[in-house]
Amino acid sequence: MPTTAFAGYPAPFIRETPSGRGKKKQQLLWGDFVTLLGEESGDWVTIRGRNEEGWIRRTKLQSERLLEVNFVDIGQGDGALIVTPDDRLILIDAGVDDHMFRFLSWRFNLRRHPDAKMRFRAAIISHSDKDHYGGFREIFDSPQFLFDAIYHNGLVERAGSNLLGERVPANGREYITDLVDDLPALQQRLADPQFVGNKVYPKLLKTAAESGRAESIRSLQATDRFLPGYDDTSELKIEICAPVREDVDGISGLRWFENAGKTKNGHSVVLRLVYHNVRILLGGDLNADAEHYLLGHYSGLDAES
């Protein structure tokens, strides 16, 4: 007998008693993971879902999990929650304020269950614009959220006149080569007060690194090919399309796009989700220069005009 199931369409309720007139305890969303607790009464069964226990009619459950992609209304900026078919959580950007934090608290019924913990397979900061990373502050501060990994694009803002680091000339262009690829490299930079200064983004990463709730913090790049755990052997594939790095005299670098703003946006983490016949492209905050660059990179044509 199966011990797990998923909420059916569109949004059934967990009830206090095995009756359609029973008090509603918690509404489920289509595809929500539930645990069957084993008690039955006619066509009613006991379950646990969204951190609540109670009764639900068996016909309101289904055996197949969905790929769930939530694009959250967070005001300015972007934020998305992905729930994979194997019931793993992936968070991509979080807006500028606490909208994503409040959505997650509602989505997983955390306010009523302050001791509950939610583990994310990944949190991805596509790039270091505040309207994409600002909302992570409350999330990284909360003991209710745990992360297998936090990913970013390798560009970490720092104090001083060179926001993204020194520009290195090569091949008639300029590149940023001072990239932060792993946790030791991040910790080394965060230990320098002159690096952090009053910049919000490195302070956010410092909060995450010192929280003890993130097992890994590292960069992503196109040569990684896939988000760890979702390669071409997985039912859900998550391809990493960008940022695309170049060799700069033996050092890995990201191309400079006119100014710091265009450069950090243009090197957003870009993901392509592939699930059966569904394709979803998550493009961060790409600009025209970056789009032409990526078109040229992947097509082999001269698209930079």
Where are these regions (language model features)?
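Beta-loop motif signature
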Residues: 1-42, 48
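Residue-level marker for buried hydrophobic side chains located in beta-strands
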Residues: 70, 90-92, 124, 280-282
